Amino acid sequence: MELQTKSPTTQNDFSQHTPMMRQYLRIKAEYPDLLVFYRMGDFYELFYDDAKKAAKLLNITLTARGQSAGHAIPMAGVPYHAVENYLTKLVRLGESVVICEQIGDPATSKGPVAREVTRIITPGTVSDEALLDEHRDNTLMVIHQEKDRFGIATLDITSGRFLIQEIISENALFAEIERIRPAELLISEENSVHPLKADSIKRRPPWEFDHATALTLLCQQFQTKSLDGFGITHLPLAITAAGCLLQYVNYTQKSALPHIHSIQAEQNEEALFIDANTRRNLELITNLQGEEVHSLAWLLDHTATPMGSRLLRRWINRPLRDQILLQQRQNAVSTLLEKRNYSEIYENLRHIGDLERIVARIALRSARPRDLMQLRQALGVLPTLHQQLTNLPLNKQLQEIKNNLGLFDELFRLLKKAIIENPPIVIRDGGVIADGYDAPLDELRNMSTNSHQFLIDLEQQERERTKINTVKVGYNRIHGYYIEISRAQAKQAPTEYIRRQTLKNVERYITPELKIFEDKVLSSRSRALAREKELYEQLLDTLIEKLIPLQQCASAIANLDVLNTLAERADTLNFNAPQFCDYPIIKIEAGRHPIVENVMTDPFMPNDTHLDEKRRMLIITGPNMGGKSTYMRQTALITLLAYIGSFVPAKNAQLGPIDRIFTRIGAADDLASGRSTFMVEMTETAAILHNATEESLVLMDEVGRGTSTFDGLSLAYACASYLATKLKAFALFATHYFELTALASTLQAVKNVHLDAVEHEEKIIFLHALREGPANKSYGLQVAQLAGIPRSVIQHARQKLEELENPVISETQQPQQNELFLPIENPVLTQLDKLNPDNLTPKQALDILYQLIQLRQQK
């Protein structure tokens, strides 16, 4: 039978269905674009297009249930106990899911069991531990656009971190999207910008982007009369975006959001600007293949807690310009390093767990018993951490951490008394609240647990009373308690025995006494479970009262974890403290690329970098594979590490104010946008030339290589000149165009350096050492030989190279390409320069004229 494809949408369509399906269709009509997981007994079922989509995405069986208009209704389902695994996969695919639970009792319901939507799971609003990456912020972002200005609001619901900002260019907008990498991005249906760097993009109706509504919603959320106290009233577009975000979160969570109690404006000038291209080229969070291995985060992340890991990535992604704050971080790292106690602090932090997200789940009332167990363990560690910090000479950063850690002795004792040592995963079946915590619960539990002895006594009593030696008293979940007698002795059953079940070899009965006992025991179990759930909710109420100090504690622990990790990394990787200056300088002694050094088996060759007011650009020449790109990247990474408060891989480093880091390294076709390699290269170069300043660090590698030699050389020359003379940015400019080295003779701030190499027996040996002056050879053929180019091809290339380097002009051969920017020799003019017309006869003059015409024709 053919499967129905679309869900019915009208009441007339509904009338053809069973009451249960009508209930489903009414709920589905409210969420037409989301997958509805509809609870039916031990399964969550999906129907119609939802079933087809889920079957494909989850690789589950597509079947059918009933009919609609003569067609079978498509159906797919997953077991309720395994639903988290399926939800995880859907969320990672960018899907949103509606969870519809049974809230009624099937045994007492007349008609369909009552059901309601209990939560909506979207990629940017999930809080369940199983659905989250513990190393990555799970951010919901909203963008509101008016003309060329953008308001941005972001919320990580798993921490309550609520931030807004305004941006005035698409380039800066895309840089922010690349930095934040939102799990879900909301934009207006009228928005002209279509950013692609988000796992899930949704368009919202324009009426959700209303400024007046946003003000009302935000004031209600923060329980204030105005937003003046938050210092954000000068950001109307961002406030509008925040209002849309809050509407969406309220829609999905269907619960209060007490952990979202503040909003903060991010100022662009507070941080180094790093565009999307530079983030990828420097491999800050992921490598060029999109994996974390061999990225800067991979190297640095030896944190003990998930929240510390996430904070470290935020620091890497947003280096600060405030040198005072950076010096405070650096001082804290120095203290932890000098006292050599980072290992002990690490061991204590390891027992904390993901306190930040546990607190958020408590606020959302979705915390599970093991969340409370982990919270109890974390609170138990705090006194030891306090003592460890007390033993240190505290600078401002460490003192703030100690103050915000807090001591929660009362909460710790409460959780110690209330929750058993190893609780089950969920509260649903009870067994979470410890004995002795609540007298009414203990009484109900005793009634249930002591039933076993009552049954033993009843069985012995009935055997003696009836003289039937096969009498047994038992229980099963379907029929409850019963008295069992063998079929052979069933005729001896007393008259007060009421037959309950007949099996092959036995008869089962119930008595009035046993029925009374059954009602009492079963009701005690259900009442005990209800009481336990009530006590659990009371615990959550108590914890929510301490929400703000618990959030402050989680933040303090994350900061301590990152600083402690930076101390360990500095010690292990031989990093040293950089020095900040208030004048223009980047002076690095024996700098190293931290990641390349870490993965190399051979010793890494350190190199110096010196840029200052009179030395703003280095033209870097040298062979391919000589280390030019590594050298440039290490300079940028050392700068960036200093600007997150870390020590750096160098013997010494002096760094002045830096506002931006740009890179133009490598390029590939952007076929999706119809852009060639050269177009991509020029677009990136244009962004740098439009946005770099005197305080920017610019890395330019092989500009102009994607076009003809003359075009490429001309562009590279002009770009380098513009950077050096107009922008006056700090620049490392790597090139194979040897003609660019001439800039150093005309521009005082430009210097030539090269990565050294030597040739031995037609083989190249890379020294990777930076030397002053230009390279004298490119060693292209030797590198090609290393790459495995056939020997015959190398020999042919060598012959051609000799011809090009030593051109011979003949009557039949065109002259070789002239050097750019040098005067071109003209044979006609050369001959004219040799003539003295006063010494020529008319015949000689005529002959020479014919020779000149011939030379001109050859030219």
UniProtKB/Swiss-Prot annotation:
Q: Which InterPro entries match?
A: DNA_mismatch_repair_MutS, DNA_mismatch_repair_MutS-lik_N, DNA_mismatch_repair_MutS/MSH, DNA_mismatch_repair_MutS_C, DNA_mismatch_repair_MutS_clamp, DNA_mismatch_repair_MutS_core, DNA_mismatch_repair_MutS_N, DNA_mismatch_repair_MutS_sf
Q: Which segments of the protein form a coiled coil according to its record? A: none
GO BP annotations listed: mismatch repair
- Provide the alphabetized UniProt keywords: ATP-binding, DNA damage, DNA repair, DNA-binding, Nucleotide-binding
Which positions are annotated as binding ATP? Answer: 622-629
The entry's function note states: This protein is involved in the repair of mismatches in DNA. It is possible that it carries out the mismatch recognition step. This protein has a weak ATPase activity.
- Specify the protein name: DNA mismatch repair protein MutS
Q: Which organism is it from?
A: Coxiella burnetii (strain RSA 493 / Nine Mile phase I)
Q: What is the lineage of its organism?
A: Bacteria, Pseudomonadati, Pseudomonadota, Gammaproteobacteria, Legionellales
